[in-house]
């Protein structure tokens, strides 16, 4: 208790020093009422925001002097009543912006303005936003109206709005933790593999300094749920037990939304093991909530006890702080975080950690792709500083060369045409996030030029995930952005795509004699509607299944891919039935969201600055070892391929 009181006193002193600087630099007519840390930001509450806004450089100057991210918010006393404020906003903003919703958050003095053309709400050089602030006093926050309505995005916004008071209290606690005075000068850094080392699944990496503990990813291996020791990260690691027991974990950072990287997050809240901040990009927050909900629904439908409850996912939402690419934030007294594009799925990020005052810099790639795809730009390879690189090795084997993307697309269309010609159906199992949208873009283009004339059905979470993609066009590839913004055409909205609403529609598609293309989750045939399609379509030789993504060991997808022709499966009444696989089985690996062997080696060649050390993870044992050996031989860089529970001292 004495320790905590001491730290609180230290933060109060830091804030007193900051107030002295702010009071000196900010004009008195701004009428400052409160200054407080909220998350990684310093928030200044004022009665007259326009006194600060009229000087466009003041906030920048303050940030430089204080070396903090600054936000200015209106004092609650000066806020115009919501009804009057809403009327004024509609008068100020051009009708062409097409505002679809306005919502007020009194606890932080923000007004959320949802518009189809957010740029017009912002105005040239932010002029319209400043005018809104001057007239209504509320701090405007502008978001894009998704062209496809997403229930996930709507529910997240509702939660953040209704829980705003608790969230403000939470952010203040986080801020005080971040800006506490360090007890120690940073002298050493260690990383420990809690999952995803020499394996694919349950990724979890613990970064430790003598001041801080930060966890990067916390996933679940859905293919191993019958064996918790292989499915979950290593809760049994002594240092991790200690960190959780003592409440010392400063932050969790999520690289992307796939369950093997974020699937265990709500579990921590269910059992009160963590109450701190989660950092990720806005699309990742939305997508991981979608996939976590889908995960427990599939568990329930399979008669299993879900790992966590919807209210635990709600806690994840309340504790998540989003960052866009390139934004630098302090997340503990000695660790600064920046997220960079990883090119794997929407919102996926390479985590860059700047530790100490230039002591050490780590980049953790998560899953990444180093060539441009239809959906995304290639992964970032330039960092301000870099000593240690932790990189994935999913396709790190010497022979893991994927076919060129153009050839993969040609092969996909060829298999589809051959299947349709003989009156069959094409099943493409795909992760709801990433591969599904990549394949959709290929099929949309070919359909537009008359190459495909059969319906394309989207089942599982794919349609909702696609709706989230439409809400974040700024995260998509340059070509897609040009199509959407300059050409006024959004390929995600094409009429060729038909979402499957329920099990009855699904059965009608299966029973129909008409050819069709079906894209369904999950991508590895582990739960979800893709399993039901497979059961009923597999016996017919007219049909085809096309795998376009990695099939992990232990999954039904891996069994089918490896050529097993008779597969025992549990039916609806709990009886085991043998499914005969007479359908054609194809694997087209050119659509993978993972870098292949050439891309991995090319990334090492081009990453700047060149790291002193590379650690290979997220791959089968031999692939991690093979990649590490090859990097050392070719580039002379020190490499390691550690096991789970190994700890490596970086400094």
Swiss-Prot record:
Cofactor: how and how many bound: Binds 2 Zn(2+) ions, which are required for nuclease activity.
Pfam families: Beta-Casp, KH_TffA, Lactamase_B_6, RMMBL
Binding site for Zn(2+) 1: 256, 258, 344, 367
Similarity comment: Belongs to the metallo-beta-lactamase superfamily. RNA-metabolizing metallo-beta-lactamase-like family. FttA subfamily.
Sequence segments annotated as region (Beta-Casp): 399-592
Oligomer status and interactors: Homodimer. Interacts with RNA polymerase (RNAP), interacts with the Spt4-Spt5 complex.
Annotated segments matching region Archaeal CPSF-KH domain: 1-200
Cofactors: Zn(2+)
Signal sequence, renumbered to the chain: none
HAMAP family: FttA
Coiled-coil residue spans: none
Stretches for region KHb: 80-147
Biological classification of the source: Archaea, Methanobacteriati, Methanobacteriota, Thermococci, Thermococcales
Single GO term (MF): RNA binding
NCBIfam families hit by this protein: arCOG00543
PANTHER family reported in the protein's UniProt record: CLEAVAGE AND POLYADENYLATION SPECIFICITY FACTOR, CLEAVAGE AND POLYADENYLATION SPECIFICITY FACTOR FAMILY MEMBER
GO biological process: DNA-templated transcription termination
Protein name as annotated: Transcription termination factor FttA
Record keywords, A-Z: DNA-binding, Endonuclease, Exonuclease, Hydrolase, Metal-binding, Nuclease, RNA-binding, Transcription, Transcription regulation, Transcription termination, Zinc
EC number(s) per entry: 3.1.-.-
Region (KHa): 12-79
Binding site for Zn(2+) 2: 260-261, 367, 618
Organism whose genome encodes this protein: Pyrococcus horikoshii (strain ATCC 700860 / DSM 12428 / JCM 9974 / NBRC 100139 / OT-3)
Region (Metallo-beta-lactamase N-terminus): 188-398
Role this protein plays: Terminates transcription on the whole genome. Termination is linked to FttA-mediated RNA cleavage and does not require NTP hydrolysis. Cleaves endonucleolytically at the RNA exit channel of RNA polymerase (RNAP); the 5'-3' exonuclease activity of this protein degrades the nascent RNA released from RNAP. Has nuclease activity on single-stranded RNA.
Transmembrane annotation, as ranges: none
Region annotation (Metallo-beta-lactamase C-terminus) ranges: 593-651
Entry superkingdom: Archaea
